[in-house]
């Protein structure tokens, strides 16, 4: 398009943003209006995208990081012919695909859910990494950010990583409209303040007037021709551009324009400009979902193997069988054992350094490009990336997260390293799967299972060695459990997983020597939980004792209660968990101090029997 046509298209995008928000009675039209010219030039002159084939491997990828400006995105979809005007006016209404913030579960042209600011660029880095190192394709990744979100630390994790990886297929456009939600942003219209920061991370930067369509066009062309480094286009804009009543005025964020019809007239009225978006380059998917039978590692019963070791060996084996599996780690691969994958498949291993938000975001970006990512770090450090996990669920993203060094059983490193909240936070994620293996063969099987699941999958692994109690051919279906001790004379049931499963078995054997029979359930699938087995145990033994190397809130005890949320009577339940603040000690001392070792389980069972709390 020529200059006049681009100006007209920008005005159309503003008008349609105003109309959509007015029809909804809510939304963010002023945030959309500031970026309308930036979007118009990109859509008409530079984006290569087949809207009829959103999965085309050669399509450019666009991420609207400032997701509240969704009216602008939907107006662009209308201009490209992907939606019609009738659908545009369903914005924010019940049943509409056009939600307040865009999600890929509703619209196939959306790469990732945004709206929690500071996430679009990190995910865009993941997509760009896939393009450069995995797909070896010529597609471009464009990310439109707001200036307010430049205060987010995750943005600068992404900027540093993109510069380090020389992602010249990535362009970020920063819409510097000066105003955030409650008032001015930190740097206002100081474009150089943003440019200096990007340059410090080895980006090429371009500062422009974000309402000069010719300058925008030149900047995009310069970005496309820049080699060896990503490009940041810093654009000075005005919030509410084009409507005097709201232009560059505070207090106009997140609300429809009060006089929408007058605003539309001031913008020149509705238009019906259609954009013929450039076709993508021919490309093909280079990875395969499967190349052969997975030959998992096999461990002998009775051996002492850390589940983290089994995870690393199993992941390497799954990577051999599946070309779509990739691994990411937060610079602790020698501890998580992700290094085993790195040695076997270095071209599919991504070192993300101590930047857990960027690591999870990169996993989401790679999943958007059809990969099956496994992202690993200490369980405790995944808490830092929790909002990215939450948003990944909203995206419907399929990612595998693995948290090692879980619980007090890590010993002397102390509480800062102990993941004690991870089961709770991962169980709370919509549609998640949470797995906690107790031995090496179980771990290997569950890693293979995870690769074929949907949604957010979490595997909890342990630092210390544990005895192999299952054979290598044992099956562990997700949603299942294993009953390891059982008799007709069971007085109660102990439910455990991971480290405490071994403690429960030792306690059960000691009790059995004194004639007290105890059932033991290995609840390796913490979510979904095996309701049938738990209900049967409650009915047959009358009392459940849960034991977990985790906080009481949200972990195995609460997972067990989920089996009785359909109106069934809740059984007598005793919950042993970590309730104090641990310190530094040996693993055995830590487990005992927390009251979750074999001795504590045995004492609890004896108390229940001796005080006739259980029959």
Per-segment meaning from a language model:
Residues 150:
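Short active-site segment of divalent metal-dependent hydrolases/proteases
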């Amino acid at each position: 398009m020529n200059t006049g046509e681009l100006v007209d298209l920008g005005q159309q995008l503003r008008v349609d943003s105003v109309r959509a928000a007015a029809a909804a009675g809510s939304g963010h039209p002023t945030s959309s209006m500031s970026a309308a010219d930036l979007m118009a030039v990109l859509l008409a002159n530079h984006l290569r995208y087949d809207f009829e084939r959103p999965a085309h491997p050669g399509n450019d990828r666009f991420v609207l990081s400032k997701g509240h400006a969704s009216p602008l995105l939907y107006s662009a979809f209308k201009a490209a012919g992907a939606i019609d005007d009738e659908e545009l006016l369903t914005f924010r209404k019940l049943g509409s695909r056009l939600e307040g913030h865009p999600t890929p579960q509703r619209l196939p042209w959306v790469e990732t859910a945004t709206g929690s600011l500071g996430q679009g660029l990190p995910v865009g880095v993941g997509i760009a990494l896939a393009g450069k190192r995995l797909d070896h394709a010529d597609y471009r990744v464009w990310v439109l950010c707001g200036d307010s979100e430049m205060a987010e630390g995750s943005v600068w994790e992404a900027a540093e990583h993109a510069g380090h990886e020389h992602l010249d297929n990535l362009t970020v456009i920063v819409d510097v409209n000066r105003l955030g939600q409650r008032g001015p942003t930190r740097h206002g219209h100081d474009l150089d303040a943003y440019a200096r920061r990007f340059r410090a991370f080895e980006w090429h930067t371009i500062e422009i007037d974000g309402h000069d369509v010719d300058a925008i066009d030149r900047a995009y062309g310069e970005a496309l021709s820049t080699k060896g480094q990503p490009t940041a286009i810093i654009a000075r804009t005005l919030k509410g551009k084009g409507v005097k009543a709201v232009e560059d005025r505070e207090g106009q964020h997140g609300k429809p324009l009060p006089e929408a019809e007058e605003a539309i007239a001031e913008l020149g009225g509705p238009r019906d400009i259609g954009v013929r978006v450039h076709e993508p380059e021919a490309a093909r998917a280079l990875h395969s979902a499967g190349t052969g039978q997975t030959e998992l590692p096999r461990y002998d019963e009775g051996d002492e193997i850390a589940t983290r070791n089994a995870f690393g060996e199993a992941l390497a084996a799954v990577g051999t069988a599946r070309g779509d599996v990739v691994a990411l780690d937060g610079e602790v691969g020698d501890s998580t054992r992700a290094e085993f994958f790195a040695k076997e498949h270095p071209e599919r291993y991504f070192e993300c350094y101590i930047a857990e938000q960027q690591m999870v975001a990169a996993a989401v970006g790679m999943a958007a490009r059809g990969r099956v990512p496994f992202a690993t770090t200490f369980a405790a450090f995944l808490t830092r990336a929790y909002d990215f996990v939450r948003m990944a669920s909203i995206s419907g993203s399929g990612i595998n997260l693995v948290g090692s060094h879980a619980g007090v059983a890590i010993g002397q490193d102390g509480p800062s390293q102990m993941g004690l909240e991870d089961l709770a936070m991962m169980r709370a994620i919509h549609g998640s799967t949470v797995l906690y293996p107790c031995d090496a063969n179980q771990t290997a099987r569950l890693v293979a299972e995870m690769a074929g699941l949907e949604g957010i999958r979490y595997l909890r692994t342990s630092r210390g060695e544990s005895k192999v109690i299952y054979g290598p051919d044992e099956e562990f279906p997700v949603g299942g459990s294993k009953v390891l001790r059982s008799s007709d004379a069971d007085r109660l049931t102990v439910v455990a997983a991971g480290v405490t499963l071994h403690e429960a078995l030792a306690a059960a054997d000691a009790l059995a020597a004194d004639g007290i029979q105890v059932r033991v359930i290995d609840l390796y699938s913490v979510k979904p939980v095996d309701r049938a087995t738990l209900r049967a145990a409650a009915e047959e033994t009358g009392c459940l004792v849960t034991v977990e190397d985790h906080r009481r809130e949200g972990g195995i005890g609460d997972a067990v209660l989920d089996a009785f949320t359909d109106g069934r009577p809740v059984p007598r339940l005793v919950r042993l968990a970590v309730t104090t603040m641990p310190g530094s000690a040996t693993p055995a001392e830590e487990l005992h101090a927390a009251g979750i070792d074999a001795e504590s389980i045995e004492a609890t069972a004896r108390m229940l029997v001796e005080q006739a709390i259980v029959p």
